Structure formats: C-alpha cells, structure tokens
Amino acid sequence: MPNSIERALEGIVVCDFSWVGAGPIATSVLAQCGADVIKIESVKRPDTLRRGEPFKDGIGTGLDRSGYFAARNANKRDIALDMSHPRAREVAVRLIEKSDIVINNFRVGQMEKWKLGWEDVQKINPRAIYVTMSMQGIDGPHSRYMGYGVNLNALCGLTARAGFPGQAPFGTGTNYTDHVMVPTHTLFGIMAALLEREATGRGQTVSLSQLESAICMTPSAPMAFAANGEALGPQGYGDPEAAPHGVYTTLGYRKWIAIAVFDDAQWATLRRVMGNPPWAEDERFATIEMRRRHAAELDERIEGWTATQYGDWLMEALLKAGVAAGEVRDAREAIEDEHLRRRGFWAYLDHPEVGVTLYNRAPIVFSRTPVEMKSAAPSIGQHTREVLGGMLGYSHGEIEDLAAQQVLV
C-alpha cells in the first residue's frame, strides 16, 4: 500500500467478478474509498441488475437505465470480457497479476471452471486476496446450492420472525442480507486480509458464507433455542425488552411514527410529553415488565394519543425530550432530509445515457481521507480499451485482434 494517499485505498486494484447485490455493494465501498475496481461483464451475460427496476423515466430498453444497478456500481471501471471464450482467461490472468483483490459471488465451482479458483489465482499472483461470497460457503453438503436474498432471509430465520403473532410469516420486503450483513462482513474480511498481507507479503482466501452472515442478523433466535428450546416466531413490532415499542398512527395522510421505550425513566419522559394523561397512572403500566405484559392495551392507548398529533412535530418533541422516535418516511422525504444533505450522503453524477442521477455514498466519513462518489456507473465495456491498453500492456493491434475474435464482448 502506498505511503502517501489521497483516499484510504488509493493504489489498491480490485478484479471484480461479482454481480447482483452483495458483491457489488462491497466493491462499491472499496471504490469510494479509492480502490480501482474493475468490473468484468459481458453483453452475453451482463450483471442481471442492469435489467432491474427502477428505470430512468420508466424506459427499460438497453442495459444502462437501471437505477438499481447504478446505485451499486458507481466509481467503477468496466471491461467487456466473454469468459466463455477460450482467450478470455489470458486477459483475466493479466488483470489478476495486477490486482490486490479478486472477488466473486458466484455459485461454488464457477471460477474453477475458468481455471481461476484460489489455487490458480495463488499461482498467478501470490499477493492477491481471493474473496468468495457463495450462498453457503465453499465446503459442506450444501456448498454448491444456489440462492438469492429471499432464500437467505428464509434459511437464516429472518422470515420466520417477520410478521405478527398468530399469522404466517410474510417476508421482509427487501433482501436485508444482500444490503447489509453480507457486504459488511465481506469488507471486514478484506481489510483484515490486507492488513495481514502487510506483515507477510502473502495473499489468502477470504471465504464468506452468505447464510452464516445472514444468521448473524438474528442472534436472539438461535440463542433462545440453545438456552431453553424455544423457537421464536413472528413478533410484530414488539420487543422483549421494551414497551411501548411499535409504529403508531399520526395526523396526516399515511403518516406513522415509531416509538421505543426501554426503561422506566424513558417512560416517565414519554408520559410528560403526553401531558401525563390519567390512564398512564394505571398499575398495568407502572414498570417495564408490566408494560410488556400488557403491551396490546398500552399500544392502543399510545395510538389514541399519537393519532391526534402531527408526526414531524411529535418526532422532534420526543427526541428533544429524550425518547427514541422516528417518523415513517418515504424515499422523497429521505432524499430531501436536511441532515443527510449536510453530511453529503447524497451525490448527483452525470451518466451519458440517463443524465444527472442520484447516488448515495457509503455511510462512513473519515477525518482525513475522503469517501467520494466520482463517476457514474459504467456501461458494459466502457473502459475495456483503457484498461487493456494501459494497465495490462496490450498493444493496439493485440486489442483489435481480441475484439475481432469476439473476446471483448
């Protein structure tokens, strides 16, 4: 790693075979921290998110109008490489020789088919850190099974907890595992491996099981079963340690507020904000244990009050008093949030096809090294000639020969 750097990962090169959600989110963070992330795709097998809604102006023709893809692939360079072509491997090998990190989230065995598994990469570049983010890890009886976020939500136990008591689980509405835990754990692994390489000069495998990462989202469920044999089911908005704890109606069109009270001092504060109504003196609500026991009755009382208040005023009043509260917001309100704007969370980048587009940066801020959104998501092959002719040392004639043989598509 260089001694004098503008951004934290300046000089780090990433050979990025990842696609869809978890992998591209992780490599996007690396790119925003300064790494040169080179995404490998082919028009024959593009990242499937290129066809994922929402599309700019609702027009989904082509492969460059997906906001979903754009959000996960800003700051990257992209080369077109048909890995099914016999000559594609030689290009990939040259890139791996220059790379610090080689990452994929394919099903186990795919990289080996291209002779680019860990054993191969280790011979090509002993300093390379080889990152694999398969569904259930690289070994074990289920290692070769495929899956997506919705399957992980189910397998890890998250779906079983989503919903309300007495009803069938109804899912989470989004693939939390793809968006949060899997890329986060992957990034921890990458940074630890980079640090260890500083001492040894050698790369290693960072093998992540997306299922195991996802299980870390619901630690209370396996612990409850291990402790007392209880299989936890849907719990709605409730929390075993808090009351009130839920989402309540407020004044206005489709408005709600989330309120959480974890101890008796917070309850006393909430009572003051409510104006100390007589019902709050009920002995059923005197302690946190009693409030949990009578949560349904308490929620009904709380909502009777919140329904007479405007959510924005109520959130500010509760937060200033010391009660955790959050107004339920939609995407427009999040984009217009003054706090997020001042922190520079949102960035606008100009894309050659869809024009100026909104992106969110990685949710970290360093005191010295910037985390930046510099370039919009790339088109397939946008940087092929730039990377091959510059970084990889191919001559103009060699690039033309590869193009003529349909390797660079």
From Swiss-Prot:
Gene3D superfamilies from the UniProt entry: Crotonobetainyl-coa:carnitine coa-transferase, domain 1, formyl-coa transferase, domain 3
EC annotation from Swiss-Prot or TrEMBL: 2.8.3.15
The reaction(s) this protein catalyses: (R)-2-benzylsuccinate + succinyl-CoA = (R)-2-benzylsuccinyl-CoA + succinate
Any GO MF annotation of the entry: succinyl-CoA:(R)-benzylsuccinate CoA-transferase activity
Induction: Induced by toluene.
Coiled-coil regions listed: none
UniProtKB keywords: Aromatic hydrocarbons catabolism, Transferase
Pathway: Xenobiotic degradation; toluene degradation
Activity regulation description: Inhibited by (S)-benzylsuccinyl-CoA.
Leading EC class: transferase
Tree of life domain: Bacteria
Active-site residues, record numbering mapped to chain: 178
InterPro entries (UniProt xref): CoA-transferase_III_domain, CoA-Trfase_fam_III, CoA-Trfase_III_dom3_sf, CoA-Trfase_III_dom_1_sf
Biological process, per Gene Ontology: toluene catabolic process
Function statement: Catalyzes the reversible conversion of (R)-2-benzylsuccinate to (R)-2-benzylsuccinyl-CoA. Inactive with (S)-benzylsuccinate.
Recorded family membership: Belongs to the CoA-transferase III family.
Subunit structure: Heterotetramer composed of 2 BbsE subunits and 2 BbsF subunits.
Name assigned to this protein: Succinyl-CoA:(R)-benzylsuccinate CoA-transferase subunit BbsF
Gene designation: bbsF
